[in-house]
C-alpha cells in the first residue's frame, strides 16, 4: 500500500489567511495522513478559533483529532492530525518534560493493509538532554510496534540526536537534508519502521508558517 504522509508545524496560525493557506497546501499535496504541531484551540492569539477544525473545514478529511499538551492563554495548545482512515484507537503519552509538557500521540488506523500505528509528537527546544530523555521514552513505545509511522517537530540540533531510536528510516537525514525550519534547521521529520519503504521526499515551502511542510511517499 502506498501512502503520502506529511508533517507540518503550523506555528499557531495567524488568522484566516494562514488557515486558508495551510489548508490549500495540504489539499494540493493530496495527503493520506498529516501530523500537525503547534495547534491552538480557543486561544486568544488565534482569535479563540479551533484551528484544527478550521483547517479541516477546507480540507474535508473524514477524521481529525487534537491532543492537548498544555493549557494556554484561555484555551488549549497541542498537536493534531488529519487522516482519511477510520480511527480504531487513540492514546496520549506524557513525555518527560522539564519546562513545557510535551506529548506523543498514538493513533491506530484501519487501512487497506490492516491496522497501522501512526504517531505524532513535538519535542522540547530547551536542551539536547531533555530531548534525549524524550526520545528514550519514545523508543520504549516504538519497540512494541511491528510497523509504524512517526511525524513530528523534533527540535534537534543535529541528526545524531535521533540515533537514540533504532531500526528506523528517516525522510530528513544527513544524506538528504531538508531545511524545514526557515530560520535554519532540519528539525521536522517523518520516521518509519525499517520494514516501510520511503520512496520520495518533498519539501513544500510555505509562506504561512515559520516551518516548511515535509512530505514523504511511502510503501507500507
Region annotations inferred by a language model:
Residues 1-58, 71-79, 136, 220:
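N-terminal, active-site-proximal structural segment of metallo-dependent hydrolase catalytic domains
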Residues 8-10, 39, 121-123, 152-154, ...:
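Active-site metal-binding loops of divalent metal-dependent hydrolases
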Residues 92-93, 108-111, 143-149, 154-220:
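Metal-dependent phosphoester-hydrolase catalytic domains
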Residues 116-160:
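Active-site beta-loop-alpha substructure in enzyme catalytic cores
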Amino acid at each position: 500500500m502506498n501512502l503520502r504522509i506529511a508533517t507540518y508545524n503550523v506555528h499557531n496560525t495567524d488568522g484566516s489567511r494562514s488557515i486558508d493557506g495551510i489548508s490549500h497546501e495540504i489539499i494540493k499535496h493530496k495527503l493520506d495522513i498529516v501530523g500537525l504541531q503547534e495547534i491552538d484551540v480557543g486561544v486568544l492569539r488565534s482569535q479563540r478559533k479551533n484551528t484544527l477544525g478550521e483547517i479541516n473545514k477546507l480540507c474535508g478529511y473524514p477524521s481529525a483529532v487534537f491532543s492537548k499538551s498544555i493549557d494556554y492563554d484561555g484555551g488549549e495548545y497541542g498537536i493534531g492530525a488529519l487522516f482519511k482512515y477510520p480511527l480504531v484507537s487513540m492514546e496520549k503519552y506524557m513525555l518527560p518534560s522539564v519546562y513545557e509538557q510535551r506529548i506523543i500521540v498514538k493513533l491506530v488506523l484501519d487501512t487497506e493493509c490492516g491496522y497501522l500505528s501512526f504517531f505524532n509528537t513535538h519535542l522540547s527546544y530547551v536542551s539536547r538532554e531533555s530531548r534525549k530523555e524524550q526520545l528514550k521514552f519514545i523508543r520504549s513505545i516504538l519497540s512494541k510496534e511491528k510497523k509504524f509511522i512517526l511525524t513530528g517537530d523534533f527540535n534537534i540540533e543535529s541528526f545524531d540526536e535521533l540515533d537514540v531510536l533504532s531500526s528506523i528510516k528517516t525522510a530528513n537525514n544527513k544524506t538528504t537534508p531538508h531545511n524545514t525550519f526557515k530560520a535554519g534547521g532540519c528539525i521536522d521529520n517523518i520516521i518509519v519502521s525499517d520494514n516501510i519503504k520511503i520512496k520520495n521526499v518533498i519539501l513544500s515551502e510555505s509562506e504561512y508558517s515559520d516551518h516548511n511542510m515535509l512530505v514523504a511517499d511511502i510503501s507500507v
